[in-house]
């Protein structure tokens, strides 16, 4: 019986074992070999007996002929290839390199040479343990191995190269030395698929990830799992690759040269089954970046817009007035020069954005006083006054008359609705010629002020500027004047407040000096037109002790027009008069454009407002029937925080008489001076101190429109 030879050189694992463990392993190996030899001997003996019996029966011999001797049983180990492969695979998986070496040493040379894949891998491991690297390289290059064992054999090959170089150099290798060895001695094709590894992702894995990314940038968790199984990557690596690729595409680096790193290496538990917020904000940002429509006045809060809506706009308390930018303000082609702008130290002021453009499209109001919602429109281009109807497609009518008991809808944005009509007053018949556009000088460069007014407080305040303000009053008015609503492209945005908000407007064309806007924001339209090309508008803006001082000097031919479509639930009361005579050339207001020409304007159904909702003022600017005023007796004091100095406000004659002169509607014809003095608790003084002086001024002869140079002062002057 043959015994297994002693192990020439024990591996590191065998040297680390105790002597008792070594003896036990040798004893187990002897028992295994004895068992295999006994089984092989029995099989050989049975085969030899059968052969001898066949020889005896097949070749009878004579009596004197000698018998052939029986073939001896071979003394060497004879195992089947399957048995040898099974034992080698079991020892390889168990990691017993010493026992594997002893088993291979006990096999005949013929068995070792014709060994299968497990035998060759076992021989390669034994050669590595013994330090026989040449035999290891020969074994690995002898035949191709399955891809499942490439990682194990590649590790053996590289470790053998490293140990061989360390033995030759006499020192340990660094990372650079190992990298150079890998480049100098590439892996054999028998244990390598030939694909270059880019960090931890192979070419095939990257191709699969890119193909999936082109079809779906946000794969579901199930798709990620299937992709991880297909590429041999983990779910974390797949998720990181998709996240990094999307980030590179957003920053613009994904479409250029291919990036070597496909993952940042940071593990993540994020599932990423839904779209990221950055991608969802793309559509919203593109929509928000669109500039708002022109011909709008934005009365916003303290926050300024993110972008300038148009090149012809001005943002007070903002950065749109920079010297390096294009002209900040262009009113119909004429530049506006901003002088003494000192708003940098007060950053809490709300922005005032003024833009100019075309008129908006009217919308029908929700709460109308009458079915036909009409508006008086003064066309700044043609100089004609027309009556627009929200439901009609023909926006212009020139000869419009009313009948008895009908209501007159007009056009203003967000005006307090009046009560139902209760009384009437007649209008004398007369022709209605088209009148030219008036040429007036505005008192202030701004058309409105953002305000917040509670239902119980009589004060008008500017948000985030001053906490107190004064009263905006409406007279004992009759008959609601329904107004059209503006289109969505031309909004009048007012800062939200707890109660109704007030905006002070200067509207000389229709004789309105005060408006009340409810808290609900409704769109409107204001146009500031300058017919004189190349004529600049000089304005001065300054902030002193929480107050805004606005000074303006406009050319005498400056045209201030107002195109106001109707708004829902808005009405402007009219002063009740026993009879208003409309002289020839005056401006009548009709209820509908469908009435025939030549008829007279009948009485207008009106009803006084409740006394509780009217705050009387000590001084106002009434328009008598002789002056053909449509709207009268409005007092509009300025707020305390926004003050116009008496010396800084241009002085111009008051008493806007509606006559048939060549000057058009709103010709100014008295010596009475219209001033905006220092605010007082009694109200704003317009013109003279009493209504009698104003009436006397209206009867005086017409004078030429005058204009004074604006001189800003440090402190307001008392009258």
Curated annotation (Swiss-Prot):
Composition bias, Basic and acidic residues: 272-282
Keyword ATP-binding: no
Compartments it resides in: Nucleus
Residue ranges of DNA binding: 194-253
UniProt xrefs under CDD domains: homeodomain
Source organism, top-level taxon: Eukaryota
One Gene Ontology molecular-function label: RNA polymerase II cis-regulatory region sequence-specific DNA binding
Annotated segments matching region Disordered: 1-73, 241-287
GO biological process entries: cell population proliferation; lens development in camera-type eye; Leydig cell proliferation; negative regulation of cell population proliferation; negative regulation of DNA-templated transcription; negative regulation of skeletal muscle satellite cell proliferation; positive regulation of transcription by RNA polymerase II; spermatid development
PANTHER family according to UniProt: HOMEOBOX PROTEIN SIX, HOMEOBOX PROTEIN SIX5
Family under the similarity heading: Belongs to the SIX/Sine oculis homeobox family.
Subunit structure: Probably binds DNA dimer. Interacts with EYA3, and probably EYA1 and EYA2.
Protein name: Homeobox protein SIX5
């Amino acid at each position: 019986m043959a015994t297994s030879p002693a192990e020439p050189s024990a591996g590191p694992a065998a040297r680390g074992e105790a002597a008792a463990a070594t003896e036990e392993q040798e004893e187990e190996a002897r028992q295994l070999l004895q068992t295999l030899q006994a089984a092989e001997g029995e099989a050989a003996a049975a085969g030899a007996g059968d052969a001898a019996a066949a020889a005896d029966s097949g070749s009878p011999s004579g009596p004197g002929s000698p018998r052939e001797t029986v073939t001896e049983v071979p003394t060497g180990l004879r195992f089947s290839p399957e048995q040898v492969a099974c034992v080698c695979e079991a020892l390889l998986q168990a990691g017993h390199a010493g026992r594997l070496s002893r088993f291979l040493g006990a096999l005949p040379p013929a068995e070792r040479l014709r060994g299968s894949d497990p035998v060759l891998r076992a021989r390669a491991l034994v050669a590595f343990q013994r330090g026989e690297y040449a035999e290891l390289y020969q074994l690995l290059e002898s035949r191709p191995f399955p891809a499942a064992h490439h990682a194990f054999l590649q590790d053996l090959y590289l470790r053998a190269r490293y140990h061989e170089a360390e033995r030759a150099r006499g020192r340990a290798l660094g990372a650079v030395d190992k990298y150079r060895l890998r480049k100098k001695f590439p892996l054999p094709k028998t244990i390598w698929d030939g694909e270059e590894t880019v960090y931890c992702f192979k070419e095939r894995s990257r191709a699969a990830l890119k193909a999936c990314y082109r079809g779906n940038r946000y794969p579901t968790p199930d798709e990620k799992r299937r992709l991880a199984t297909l590429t041999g990557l983990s779910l974390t690596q797949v998720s990181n690759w998709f996240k990094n690729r999307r980030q590179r595409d957003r920053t613009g680096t994904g479409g250029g040269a291919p990036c070597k790193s496909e993952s940042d290496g940071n593990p993540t538990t994020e599932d990423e089954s839904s779209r990221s917020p950055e991608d969802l904000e793309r559509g919203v940002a593109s929509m928000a970046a669109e500039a708002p429509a022109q011909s709008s006045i934005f009365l916003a809060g303290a926050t300024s817009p993110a972008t300038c809506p148009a090149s012809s706009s001005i943002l007070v308390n903002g950065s749109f007035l920079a010297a390096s930018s294009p002209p900040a303000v262009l009113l119909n082609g004429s530049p506006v020069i901003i002088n003494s702008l000192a708003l940098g130290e007060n950053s809490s002021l709300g922005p005032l954005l003024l833009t100019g453009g075309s008129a908006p499209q009217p919308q029908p109001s929700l709460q109308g006083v009458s079915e036909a919602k009409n508006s008086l429109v003064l066309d700044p281009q043609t100089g004609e006054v027309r009556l627009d109807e929200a439901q009609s497609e023909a926006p212009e009518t020139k000869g419009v008359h009313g009948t008895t008991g009908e209501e007159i809808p007009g056009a203003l944005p967000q005006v307090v609705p009046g009560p139902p009509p209760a009384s009437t007053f007649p209008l004398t018949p007369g022709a209605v010629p088209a009148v030219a556009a008036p040429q007036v000088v505005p008192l202030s460069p701004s058309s409105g002020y953002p305000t917040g007014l509670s239902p119980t407080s009589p004060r008008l305040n500017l948000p985030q500027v001053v906490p107190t303000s004064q009263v905006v009053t409406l007279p004992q008015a009759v008959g609601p004047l329904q107004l059209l609503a503006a289109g969505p492209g031309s909004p009048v945005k007012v800062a939200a407040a707890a109660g109704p908000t007030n905006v002070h407007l200067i509207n000389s064309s229709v004789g309105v000096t005060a408006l009340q806007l409810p808290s609900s924001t409704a769109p409107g339209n204001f146009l500031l037109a300058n017919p004189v090309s190349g004529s600049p508008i000089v304005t001065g803006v300054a902030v002193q002790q929480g107050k805004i001082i606005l000074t303006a000097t406009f050319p005498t031919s400056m045209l201030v027009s107002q195109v106001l479509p109707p708004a829902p639930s808005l009405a402007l009361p009219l002063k009740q008069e026993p009879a208003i005579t409309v002289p020839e050339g005056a401006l009548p207001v009709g209820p509908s454009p469908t009435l025939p020409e030549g008829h007279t304007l009948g009485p207008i159904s009106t009803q006084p407002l409740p006394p509780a909702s009217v705050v009387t003022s000590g001084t106002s600017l009434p328009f008598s029937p002789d002056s053909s005023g449509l709207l009268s007796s409005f007092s509009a004091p300025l707020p305390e925080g926004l003050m116009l100095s008496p010396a800084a406000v241009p002085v111009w004659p008051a008493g806007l008489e509606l006559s048939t002169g060549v000057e058009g509607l709103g010709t100014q014809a008295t010596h009475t001076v219209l001033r905006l003095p220092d605010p007082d608790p009694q109200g704003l003084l317009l013109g003279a101190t009493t209504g009698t002086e104003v009436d006397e001024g209206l009867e005086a002869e017409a004078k030429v429109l005058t204009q004074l140079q604006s001189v800003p002062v440090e402190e307001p002057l008392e009258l």
